[in-house]
Amino acid sequence: TAKTRIGFDDTEEFDYLNNFIHKMRDAGAKTFILHARKAMLTGLSPKQNLNIPKLNYKMVYEIKKKNPELEIIINGGISKIDEIDNHLKFCDGVMIGRSIYQNPYSLVEIEKEIFKTKDNPTREQVAEKLLEYLDREVKLGTKVNHIMRHTVGLYHGQVGSKEWKR
């Protein structure tokens, strides 16, 4: 498996990316997670690189079209169920990053919509399981903040979310 951006600095050409993927394939990679944004290695901070270079989903779609034998997973700026549905028409999978970190409960909503699951856990049930996990980990010496800092978004957009974050 390899994860890469579609280009860097002044290089965002289909042939360059396709050749790079072929080299990785020849080395044994079968799954490629393609972030649909090039990386600006000079002039932008890592934080700026999260938003400033434009997303180019079509290049990822074209890579899949030219390489149907490879598993191509698209990544970059994806946060809504309709976006996921659309990308799945052209790619084998979707990787969601920041939006899941900001609102982890959206994974339950995505699972319900995409996979038609039933009996999905409520936020409260997720919080209860989290507390059980936290209790076990604290007994093993894990610091509370090492876990809790990744869960502040569990009640994202809900009444009382500020209390959860505290």
Task: Please place each PLM-identified region on the residue numbering.
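Alpha/beta catalytic cores of nucleotide-metabolism and tRNA/nucleoside-modifying enzymes
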Residues: 8-10, 14-22, 27-31, 55-74, ...
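Glycine-rich, proline-tolerant flexible connector loops at the mouths of alpha/beta enzymes
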Residues: 36-50
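Short, structured patches in soluble enzyme cores that scaffold and shape functional sites
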Residues: 2-6, 33-38
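A short alpha-helix capping/helix-coil boundary motif
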Residues: 1, 39-41, 62-63
